[in-house]
């Protein structure tokens, strides 16, 4: 039978608490246990006090009013070691002069997850160049990476996650486990 069942409560870590990460963390924390990971102590403290570190009406409202199974932490290693999914929403800075995406933050997360929890399925939500998921799988020697692009407007990020126009999850051909993980993740986003 299937190891992961959508009816089970899953444990999910979210790397990065910008618009993308925080809105996903809040969305998922309505039904699952979510650990939001950031490197900035002030942001972690605010989230744990149920205050939003960013300006977004829905995020502020949900943090204040909803019952969320959400904690924020600076301890990435511990967070990643005990979860089923790691949603990667780390910043990727685009350099227009070099026509280059700096994906180093994303890769740091992938390396750490691979080392502390090789079975966790990683879902990249960060903005990344075309073909990146495949190349990073080879470069970092891990299969467990899927990509789910975002269609969010700043300051409407949580709203757009609550009422998505579409949900896309990309994964490699012929890998049954990732195929299932992709379907589960898509369902999580629609609960």
Name each region found by the language model.
Residues 1-6:
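Short, small-residue-biased leader/transition segments that mark boundaries at the very start
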Residues 12-14, 122, 167:
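Conserved hydrophobic helix-helix packing surfaces used for dimerization/oligomerization
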Residues 54-55:
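N-terminal FAD cofactor-binding segment of flavoenzymes
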Residues 88-91, 126, 171-172:
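Glycine-rich, N-terminal phosphate-binding loop of Rossmann-like dinucleotide-binding domains
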Residues 94-157:
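Rossmann-like NAD(P)(H) cofactor-binding subdomain of soluble oxidoreductases
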Residues 135-148, 153-191:
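Internal alpha-helical scaffold of NAD(P)-dependent oxidoreductase catalytic cores
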